[in-house]
C-alpha cells in the first residue's frame, strides 16, 4: 500500500547520490541549484574576454561543495566511482576483457562492431573505429546511464538483491575507471571512451540486465512464488538471464541475433507434444479471424497431434536446427572470449521442449515463457554497418518447367487484377487527372523525400532581428511536406519523369531504421517523382485493403479479409486485435502453419513478382486508357513509377565499401588513382579511384602496416532489381504476391494429399503467412510429406523459408509479434526503456512524461512489474528536462545571464523535481499518474475523490502536503509560433487548390465576398501560408530556432507563478467540460454483489492490473463513440489533403462565429472554400445540421482517460459498462453522459485495483432545493458561450442552454 512513499524515498536517495551536494528531501516540490563548467569561460577567453577569478579555484570549490551563486548551492554530477562504489570481482568481466581486440584485428565491414581496445596514440584505424563506435554504441534514451545506475543501486539496497549487471559495472569501474562520459543535457554526446570502444554498450547491457533481474524479483514477490517452473522442474530466472548475458558479452549484437530465433521457437513449441493439454477455452464468430471472442474458462483436452509431434521428421529437424544454432552461438562466444561457459538451463529446456507440460493456469510457467521472449532486449538496438550490396542476379531463379516461378508470377498478376476490381466495387478508384496535384499531398509526411529544398526563415527575435520581418536564416530540408510545398510543381515535369537513376551521376540514396534486437533495416528513400506515378495507380489498393474486412476462408473469392494491411486490426490494444490467435490456439483440432520467409524482399525478382505485378496493373488500367495526366497515358505513368532506371535496375548509394590494405601499397599508387571522386569516403578512410584498385590492394595486404581505403567514383553503388521497401505499394504488393505463393501451396497440397489436410483460414500481412488448418490423417509419414511439399513449393517459387523458424504446431499461434499459447497471451515485452532509436529532443516535458505513463502502462500489460514501473517513472519525473535552461540566472527573480561577467559566466541553473510530482494532475503541473494503478489518470476530480477514499489515504497524505507547489514545466511547443515565419512561396498551392478555392482566388467579386467570412487562417487567401507554416514547424532545424526565444518566455512564466493559486474548475475552457464537471452533482455508490470473476487471456499481470481484469473483464463490445468532436474529426480524416491542418476545433470555432442555423448546402460551400474536398464538406455539413448537434455544442476534454493499451482491453466505456455501473439523469446531454462515462470508468477501475467490491454509481442532482438551484445555475453557465458570442447566438442556436435552464427545477 505505502509503496509510493517508500518508492519516493528510494528515488530521492538516488537523486542525492547522483547530484553531489544537492539536498532532495521531500520538503518541497522542486529544487533549484547551479551547475558550473569552465568550458564557456575557456571559449570566451579565446575571443578576448578577461576574468579575475581562476577556473581552477572555482572547480576546486565546486568539487569540495563550497561553491554558491546568489545563495544557491552549486552541485556536480557524481563520478562513476561515487555511484559504483562496491569492490567486486566478476568472472563475466574477465570474459569481456579477454574478448577485446587490438585495432589491427579490425574487419572494416563486419556487420556489428566487436570489442576494440581504446588506443591513446595515433593509429591509422583509430578514427574509423571511433566513428563506427559513436554510431553503433549509441544509447540515446531519456535518462543518462549514470541516473539509471544510481536508481538501480538504490533498488538493490532496498531489495537486498544484487543483479549481475550492477556487479559487472562496479567491477569495470574498479578496474579501469570511467567507461565513458555522457553529456546530461544532450545524451547523444558520448566521449572519452575508457579502455574499450564498446563500453557504452556494455553499460547499457548491465543496466538492462539489472532491470530484467529486478523485474523478476518484484514479479515473483507479487505472485508469491520462489522460482519459475518448466513443467515440474524448478528454474531460477536470475541464472537464466545471467547465462544469456555472459554468452553475449564477447560480441553482444551478433550473438543475440543468432540466439533470437531459438528463444522464440522454444516458447512457441513448449509442450505441443504432451498427450493432455490445459487450455483457456473461448467461443467466437464463424470466421477463424473473428474478433468477437468470449472466454469461458480453463479445461483439459486431449492433444490429437502429440504422436505426430514426437515421431515426425519435421519436429526432429526443427529441434536439431535450433540446438545447432544455440551451440554455434556458444562456441563462437567461447572462442572470442576464451571461456568455457555454456547455457545449461536453456539447453536443458530446449532438449525437453515438446514433452514438458505448459500449464496456462500456473503463473510460474507463463512468466518463464514471457521472460524468454523479453530477455533479448539486453543488447539494445541492433545498430549495424549494412554493406551496400547489389542484387545477386546469378542466384535469382528463372522460370523453367521444373519450378513454379512463372506460375507464381501469373498468380501475382491475377491477384492484382482481382484486387483492382474488388477495390473498384468497394468504391475506390485511381487518382483522376484533376485530383493529381491534390493527391500528392498524401505523400507530405515528415520523412525524407530523396530531394532537398532551401527555405528562408525569418527569426523575429534576437540581437540581429531589427524590426519588421526579422533576421533571415536559410535552412535546408529534406522532409517531404516542405519539398512538396516548395517544389511540388516540378515533380511532374518531363525532365524529372524521364530521369533514369542508374548512373553514378543520377542515383538514389538508402536510409536506415534501427530496431531492437534485429539488425538495422534498410529503407529506400525513393524519389518523389517516382512515388507520385506509383500513388496514382496504386491508391485504390492501399485505400481499399486498409479498411476492407471479410472472410478468410480459402474458398472465398474476395481478398478483403485475407489481406490485412492498414489500421484494420489496430484498435490500439494487442489483446483485442489478436483475439483470433487466442481462440485458435485453444482449439484442439487446429494446426497452425505460420511461414517465416527469410529476406522476402530480396527474393521478389522480376521473374516471380515484378513482371506479374506490372502486367496486372496494366491490365487493370485498361478501363482508364482514355485518361491523360499532363498529356501522359497510364501506361507511361506505370513506366515512370516502376520502369527501368526508375525502380527496376536502379543504382543506390549506401555505406561506402571499405577495404583494409597495406600502407606502402597505397603510397605506391599514382596520384591519379588516389584522387578523391564525387563520393566522400567515411572518416578515417583514404580515397581510391575505383573498387577494382581496392580489391587488388586487398589481395596483396598481408598483415603489414594497414590502412583503410574506399572507392570514390561510385563504382561501389549497389544495382538493385528486386522489390524496394519504400515503394508506395510495398505492403499491398508483398501481400498479393504472398497470397499467390499461398495459393500454390494449397493447390499442390490438395493435388497430392487430397483431404488429408483442410485449410480453414488464410491470412497475409506483407511477408507473414498464417494458415489455420485441420489435419485429417494421423500418419506421421503423410504429415512429413505435407510439410516437405510446403517447403518445396516455397523453394520452387524462388523464395527461402527456414524450418527452424517456421511454426507448424497445435495449441500455438504467432501473428505479427503476438504470441498465443493454449488460449492465453504470452506477452513479448520488447519495449526499450534505457535506449531509443534516435536522439530524443524533448520539447514538452509534461507531454513527454504523460506519454511515458502510457508506455509504462503498456509495459505492465506485457508482464512488467507495476511497482518497478512506478519507481522508474518517479525517477524520470524528477530528472527529465532538468537541464533545459541555458542562460537563465536566479537572482531574486529569473533573468538572462550577464555576458562576459566574472561572477556569472560558466553557471547554469538546473531544476530538479520531487519524485511525487509524478502523481499530481497535469493541470497542477504534475504528470497525472495514479499511485493505485498506472492506467488510472490523476485528474483534479480524481485527486479530490482519492483524498476522500479511505483505501487511498496512505498514498494521498504525502501528496496533500505539497499540493500545487510545482512551478510551470518547460514546453517549447507553447512558444509563440509567429516568432518564425517564411516568405518562401508555396508555389505548389495553385496546383493543389481545389476548384472552390481556385474560383475565389481568380474571381475578384467572389473573393471580396469571401473576405468578409470569419475563416481566419483557413480563408483561401491565407490557407497556403497556414499550411506552409505548419509544415515549417515540423522541420527540426526551424523549430530549434524557437528554443532560445522560448527560454525568455519561460522566465516570465516562472516569474509570474505563485504556489497554491490553482482553482478547481468545473469547466476547462469555454464550452468544454472534463470529468471535473461531475463534482457539481451528487454521486451515490451502491455495491454490486454476486458479480462473477471473469476469464481473460492476458494473465501475466501485476496485481493492480490483474484485479481490474478479473472484476471488469475483457472488452466484449465496441467502445461507445465519444463526443461529437470525435465524429467531426473522423469525418475530416477522410480528406487526405487537409487532415492534420483542419481539426474539429477549427470547425467548431468557425461555427461559433457564424452560428449553426445555416442550411447544409451553405455550410458545404463554406467548407469547400476552406479547401476541403466536396464529399467531406458535404458529409460534414449534413452531420452538423442534424438536430442532435444543434442541441449539444459542448466539447469534452478526455485528458487521456481510458486511452492506454491496457484500459482499451477492459470492459469500460462500453454500453455494457453503462448498463451495469451507471445511473444518470435522462436530461443529461450526450457530452454530459460522455463525461459521466469517463468519470465512472476511472472509479470502477480504482475500486477493482484496490480490491473493493464493484459498485454502481448513481449521478443525481441534490434533493436540497437550495443546492439544486446552484447546480442548475452552474450547469446553465457551462452551456453558455462568452457574452460576445451570446449576442449572435442566443436566439436559436443555443436551445441547448435554454433546455438546460428549465431542467431539474
Swiss-Prot record:
Record has Nucleotidyltransferase as a keyword: yes
EC class (word): transferase
UniProt similarity note: Belongs to the reoviridae RNA-directed RNA polymerase family.
A Gene Ontology molecular function term of the record: nucleotide binding
PROSITE patterns reported in the protein's UniProt record: RDRP_DSRNA_REO (PS50523)
Organism: African horse sickness virus (AHSV)
Pfam families: Orbi_VP1
Keywords attached to this entry: Nucleotide-binding, Nucleotidyltransferase, RNA-directed RNA polymerase, Transferase, Viral RNA replication
Catalytic activity, as annotated: RNA(n) + a ribonucleoside 5'-triphosphate = RNA(n+1) + diphosphate
Cross-referenced InterPro entries: DNA/RNA_pol_sf, RNA-dir_pol_reovirus, RNA_pol_orbivir
RdRp catalytic domain mapped to chain residues: 563-814
GO biological processes: DNA-templated transcription; viral genome replication
Enzyme Commission number: 2.7.7.48
Domain of life: Viruses
Coiled-coil segments: none
Protein name, UniProt field: RNA-directed RNA polymerase
Amino acid at each position: 500500500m505505502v509503496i509510493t512513499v517508500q518508492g519516493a524515498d528510494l528515488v530521492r536517495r538516488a537523486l542525492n547520490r547522483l547530484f553531489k551536494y544537492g539536498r532532495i528531501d521531500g520538503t518541497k516540490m522542486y529544487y533549484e541549484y547551479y551547475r558550473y563548467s569552465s568550458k564557456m569561460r575557456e571559449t570566451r577567453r579565446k575571443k578576448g574576454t578577461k576574468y579575475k577569478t581562476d577556473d581552477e579555484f572555482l572547480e576546486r570549490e565546486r568539487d569540495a561543495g563550497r561553491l554558491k551563486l546568489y545563495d544557491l548551492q552549486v552541485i556536480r554530477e557524481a563520478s562513476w566511482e561515487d555511484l559504483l562504489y562496491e569492490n567486486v570481482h566478476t568472472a563475466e568481466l574477465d570474459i569481456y576483457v579477454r574478448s577485446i581486440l587490438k585495432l589491427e584485428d579490425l574487419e572494416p565491414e563486419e556487420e556489428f562492431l566487436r570489442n576494440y581496445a581504446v588506443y591513446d596514440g595515433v593509429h591509422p584505424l583509430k578514427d574509423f573505429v571511433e566513428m563506427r563506435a559513436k554510431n553503433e554504441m549509441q544509447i540515446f534514451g531519456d535518462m543518462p546511464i549514470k541516473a539509471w545506475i544510481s536508481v538501480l543501486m538504490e533498488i538493490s539496497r532496498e531489495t537486498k538483491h544484487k543483479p549481475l549487471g550492477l556487479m559487472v559495472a562496479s567491477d569495470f569501474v574498479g578496474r579501469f575507471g570511467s567507461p565513458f562520459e555522457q553529456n546530461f543535457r544532450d545524451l547523444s554526446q558520448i566521449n572519452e571512451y575508457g579502455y574499450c570502444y564498446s563500453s557504452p554498450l556494455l553499460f547499457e547491457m548491465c543496466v538492462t540486465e539489472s532491470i530484467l533481474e529486478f523485474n523478476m524479483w518484484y514479479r515473483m514477490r507479487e505472485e508469491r512464488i520462489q522460482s519459475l517452473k518448466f513443467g515440474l522442474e524448478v528454474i531460477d530466472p536470475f541464472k537464466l538471464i545471467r547465462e544469456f548475458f555472459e554468452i553475449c558479452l564477447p560480441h553482444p549484437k551478433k550473438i543475440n541475433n543468432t540466439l533470437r530465433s531459438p528463444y522464440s521457437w522454444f516458447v512457441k513449441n513448449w509442450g505441443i507434444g504432451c498427450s493432455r493439454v490445459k487450455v483457456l477455452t473461448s467461443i467466437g464468430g464463424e470466421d477463424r479471424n473473428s474478433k468477437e471472442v468470449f472466454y469461458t474458462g480453463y479445461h483439459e483436452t486431449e492433444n490429437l497431434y502429440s504422436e505426430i509431434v514426437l515421431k515426425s521428421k519435421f519436429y526432429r529437424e526443427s529441434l536439431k536446427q535450433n540446438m545447432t544454432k544455440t551451440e554455434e552461438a556458444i562456441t563462437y562466444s567461447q572462442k572470442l572470449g576464451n571461456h568455457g561457459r555454456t547455457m545449461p538451463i536453456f539447453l536443458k529446456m530446449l532438449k525437453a521442449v515438446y514433452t514438458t507440460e505448459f500449464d496456462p493456469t500456473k503463473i510460474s510457467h507463463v512468466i518463464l515463457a514471457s521472460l524468454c521472449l523479453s530477455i533479448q532486449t539486453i543488447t539494445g538496438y541492433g545498430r549495424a554497418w549494412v554493406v551496400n550490396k547489389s542484387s545477386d542476379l546469378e542466384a535469382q531463379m528463372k522460370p523453367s518447367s521444373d519450378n513454379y516461378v512463372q506460375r507464381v508470377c501469373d498468380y501475382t498478376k491475377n491477384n492484382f487484377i482481382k484486387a483492382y476490381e474488388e477495390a473498384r466495387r468497394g468504391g475506390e478508384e485511381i487518382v483522376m487527372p484533376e485530383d493529381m496535384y491534390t493527391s500528392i499531398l498524401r505523400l507530405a509526411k515528415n520523412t525524407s523525400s530523396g530531394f532537398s529544398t532551401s527555405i528562408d526563415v525569418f527569426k523575429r527575435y534576437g540581437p540581429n532581428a531589427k524590426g519588421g520581418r526579422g533576421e533571415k536564416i536559410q535552412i535546408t530540408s529534406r522532409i517531404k511536406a516542405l519539398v512538396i510545398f516548395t517544389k511540388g510543381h516540378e515533380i511532374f515535369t518531363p525532365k524529372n519523369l524521364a530521369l533514369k537513376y542508374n548512373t553514378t551521376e543520377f542515383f538514389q540514396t538508402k536510409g536506415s531504421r534501427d530496431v531492437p534486437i534485429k539488425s538495422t533495416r534498410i529503407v529506400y528513400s525513393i524519389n518523389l517523382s517516382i512515388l507520385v506515378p506509383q500513388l496514382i495507380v496504386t491508391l485504390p489498393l492501399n485505400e481499399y485493403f486498409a479498411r476492407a474486412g471479410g472472410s478468410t476462408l480459402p474458398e472465398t473469392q474476395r481478398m478483403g479479409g485475407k489481406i490485412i494491411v492498414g489500421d484494420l486490426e489496430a484498435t490500439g490494444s494487442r489483446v483485442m486485435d489478436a483475439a483470433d490467435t487466442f481462440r485458435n490456439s485453444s482449439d484442439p483440432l487446429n494446426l497452425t502453419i505460420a511461414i517465416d520467409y527469410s529476406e522476402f524482399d530480396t527474393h521478389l525478382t522480376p521473374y516471380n513478382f515484378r513482371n506479374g505485378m506490372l502486367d496486372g496493373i496494366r491490365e487493370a488500367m485498361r478501363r482508364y486508357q482514355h485518361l491523360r495526366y499532363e498529356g501522359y497515358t497510364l501506361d507511361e505513368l506505370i513506366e515512370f513509377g516502376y520502369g527501368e532506371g526508375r525502380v527496376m535496375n536502379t543504382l543506390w548509394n549506401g555505406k561506402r565499401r571499405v577495404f583494409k590494405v597495406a600502407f606502402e601499397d597505397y603510397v605506391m599508387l599514382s596520384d591519379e588513382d588516389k584522387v578523391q571522386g564525387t563520393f566522400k569516403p567515411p572518416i578515417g578512410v583514404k580515397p581510391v579511384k575505383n573498387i577494382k584498385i581496392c580489391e587488388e590492394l586487398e589481395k596483396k595486404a598481408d598483415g603489414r602496416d594497414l590502412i583503410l581505403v574506399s572507392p570514390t567514383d561510385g563504382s561501389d553503388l549497389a544495382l538493385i532489381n528486386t522489390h524496394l521497401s519504400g515503394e508506395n505499394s510495398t505492403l499491398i504488393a508483398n501481400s498479393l504476391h504472398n497470397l499467390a505463393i499461398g495459393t500454390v501451396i494449397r493447390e499442390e497440397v490438395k493435388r497430392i494429399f487430397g483431404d488429408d489436410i483442410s485449410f480453414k483460414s488464410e491470412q497475409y500481412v506483407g511477408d507473414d503467412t498464417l494458415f489455420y488448418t485441420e489435419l485429417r490423417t494421423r500418419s506421421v509419414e503423410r504429415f512429413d510429406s505435407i510439410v516437405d511439399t510446403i517447403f518445396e513449393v516455397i523453394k520452387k517459387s524462388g523464395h527461402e523459408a527456414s524450418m527452424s523458424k517456421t511454426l507448424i504446431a497445435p495449441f500455438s499461434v504467432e501473428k505479427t509479434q503476438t504470441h498465443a499459447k493454449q488460449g492465453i497471451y504470452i506477452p513479448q515485452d520488447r519495449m526499450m526503456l534505457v535506449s531509443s532509436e534516435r536522439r530524443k529532443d524533448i520539447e514538452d516535458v509534461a507531454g513527454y512524461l504523460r506519454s511515458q505513463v502510457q508506455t509504462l502502462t503498456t509495459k505492465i500489460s506485457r508482464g512488467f512489474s507495476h511497482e518497478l514501473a512506478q519507481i522508474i517513472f518517479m525517477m524520470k519525473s524528477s530528472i527529465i528536462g532538468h537541464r533545459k535552461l541555458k542562460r537563465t540566472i536566479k537572482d531574486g527573480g529569473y533573468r538572462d545571464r550577464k555576458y562576459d561577467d566574472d561572477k556569472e559566466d560558466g553557471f547554469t541553473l538546473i531544476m530538479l523535481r520531487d519524485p511525487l510530482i509524478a502523481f499530481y494532475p497535469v493541470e497542477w503541473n504534475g504528470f497525472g499518474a495514479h499511485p493505485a494503478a498506472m492506467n488510472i489518470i490523476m485528474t483534479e476530480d480524481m485527486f479530490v475523490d482519492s483524498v476522500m477514499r479511505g483505501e487511498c489515504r496512505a498514498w494521498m497524505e504525502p501528496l496533500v502536503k505539497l499540493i500545487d507547489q510545482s512551478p510551470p514545466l518547460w514546453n517549447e511547443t507553447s512558444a509563440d509560433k509567429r516568432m518564425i515565419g517564411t516568405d518562401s512561396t508555396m508555389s505548389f498551392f495553385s496546383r493543389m487548390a481545389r476548384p472552390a478555392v481556385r474560383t475565389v482566388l481568380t474571381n475578384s467579386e467572389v473573393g471580396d465576398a469571401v473576405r468578409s467570412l470569419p475563416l481566419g487562417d483557413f480563408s483561401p487567401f491565407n490557407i497556403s501560408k497556414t499550411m506552409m507554416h505548419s509544415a515549417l514547424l515540423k522541420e527540426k532545424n526551424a523549430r530549434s530556432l524557437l528554443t532560445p526565444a522560448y527560454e525568455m518566455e519561460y522566465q516570465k512564466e516562472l516569474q509570474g507563478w505563485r504556489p497554491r493559486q490553482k482553482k478547481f474548475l468545473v469547466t476547462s475552457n469555454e464550452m468544454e467540460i472534463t470529468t471535473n464537471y461531475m463534482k457539481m452533482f451528487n454521486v451515490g455508490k451502491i455495491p454490486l454483489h454476486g458479480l462473477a470473476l471473469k476469464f481473460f487471456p492476458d494473465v501475466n499481470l501485476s496485481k493492480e492490473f490483474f484485479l481490474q481484469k478479473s472484476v471488469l473483464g475483457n472488452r466484449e463490445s465496441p467502445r461507445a463513440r465519444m463526443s461529437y468532436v470525435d465524429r467531426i474529426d473522423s469525418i475530416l480524416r477522410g480528406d487526405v489533403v487537409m487532415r492534420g491542418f483542419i481539426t474539429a476545433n477549427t470547425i467548431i470555432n468557425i461555427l461559433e462565429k457564424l452560428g449553426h442555423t445555416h442550411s447544409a448546402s451553405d455550410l458545404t460551400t463554406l467548407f469547400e472554400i476552406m479547401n476541403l474536398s466536396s464529399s467531406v464538406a458535404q458529409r460534414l455539413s449534413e452531420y452538423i445540421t442534424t438536430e442532435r448537434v444543434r442541441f449539444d455544442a459542448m466539447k469534452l476534454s478526455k485528458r487521456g482517460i481510458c486511452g492506454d493499451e491496457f484500459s482499451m482491453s477492459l470492459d469500460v466505456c462500453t454500453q455494457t459498462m453503462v448498463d451495469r455501473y451507471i445511473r444518470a439523469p435522462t436530461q443529461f446531454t450526450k457530452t454530459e453522459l460522455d463525461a459521466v462515462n469517463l468519470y465512472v470508468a476511472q472509479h470502477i477501475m480504482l475500486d477493482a485495483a484496490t480490491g473493493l467490491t464493484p459498485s454502481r454509481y448513481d449521478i443525481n442532482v441534490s434533493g436540497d432545493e437550495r443546492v439544486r438551484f446552484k447546480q442548475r445555475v452552474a450547469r446553465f453557465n457551462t452551456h453558455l458561450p462568452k457574452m460576445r458570442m451570446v449576442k449572435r447566438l442566443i436566439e436559436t442556436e443555443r436551445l441547448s442552454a435554454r433546455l438546460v435552464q428549465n431542467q431539474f427545477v
